[in-house]
Design a protein with these regions (language model features):
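Conserved beta-strand segments of alpha/beta enzyme cores
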Residues: 32, 95, 193-196
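Flexible, glycine-rich terminal cap/loop adjacent to redox cofactors
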Residues: 152-153, 164, 169-287
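A short, glycine/Asx- and small/polar-enriched loop/turn
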Residues: 44-49, 121, 212-215
């Protein structure tokens, strides 16, 4: 298997440590990972496909260093955008901005707001992928509920778009919520002054060993001085299940201390969350 990624790392929206960890595991399993690489040509052959690859830098492909590989099949997976062609009569006059239907939702402002999801046409509402990122099924579902409840005259609790879990169903899985370390440093925050990080490797985790999947890491970023959960990033066999606890913690503005004093059942994968939280305070007990 050859994975071709135009950017400089796989899963570029995830925490860099998680991306690097997944790439290391994939290479160890025999996968060929090509980052900073693009596809310049694809030809169908009798046996499958012939693909031309070239280094990609500064928005350009370096054709002088192109190479060709052959494969049985090719899978194109370069992102998601809302598709609404033929979904409505164009004569309605719905306002479309940057490939999405315009509503009172603005991806640039993820904080909780009393949104209606009204479009530019009275009586017409839009939710989900067609109104912009994040393009996630669980977000679309929640938007639909909030939208309909507001139409019905209720006063639903607004969605906090800064607390949306992201899940990648690879193996091992990847899941995250909140800020990555780079996002914090880009905002001028400094490690050990404004935030601390706790990481817990699953290599010695009892339940992970018993299940035969002890490769991965749980990483928690907590703010200073209060200890609130700023971000959480997981590479693990059950990462998409584990992220729920940390999503709830961030939504309720819980602190690492509150996670630490919560007894986690043993043996469970959720103990890894507890261990990472302890590590963020420098209290991890060596196992």
């Amino acid at each position: 298997v050859t994975v071709v990624e135009m950017l400089d790392r796989i899963l570029p929206v995830e925490d860099e440590e998680i991306s690097a960890g997944l790439e290391k595991l994939y290479k160890k399993s025999g996968m060929d990972i090509r980052t900073s690489t693009t596809t310049t040509n694809v030809e169908k052959t009798k046996k499958g496909v012939k693909v031309t690859l070239a280094p990609f830098k500064d928005g350009k492909a370096d054709e002088s260093k192109a190479e060709t590989i052959e494969a049985d099949k090719i899978l194109l997976a370069i992102g998601v955008k809302g598709r609404f062609d033929e979904a409505f009569d164009e004569s309605l006059g719905l306002q479309v901005v940057k490939d999405h239907i315009k509503t009172d939702y603005d991806p640039a402002h993820p904080e909780p707001q009393e949104l209606t999801y009204k479009t530019s046409v009275p009586g017409v509402y839009a939710v989900g992928d067609v109104i912009g990122p994040p393009w996630l099924a669980h977000v679309a579902s929640e938007e639909a509920i909030v939208c309909v409840e507001r139409i019905a005259g209720h006063d639903p609790i607004p969605i906090d778009y800064s607390v949306i879990p992201g899940c990648t169903y690879c193996h091992p899985q990847v899941a995250s919520v909140g800020f990555t370390e780079k996002m914090l440093t880009d905002r001028g925050l400094k490690k050990d002054e404004d935030y601390q990080i706790g990481s817990y490797n699953l290599q010695a985790h009892g339940k992970a060993i018993a299940a035969g999947h002890n490769q991965g890491i749980v990483k928690i970023i907590r703010g200073l001085p209060r200890g609130e959960i700023l971000g959480a990033h997981i590479l693990a066999d059950q990462a998409t299940e584990l992220i729920a606890e940390l999503t709830l913690a961030r939504r309720l503005e819980a602190t690492s201390e509150e996670i630490n004093v919560t007894v986690h059942a043993h043996p469970t994968m959720h103990e890894a969350v507890h261990e990472a939280s302890l590590a963020s305070e420098g209290r991890l007990i060596p196992g």
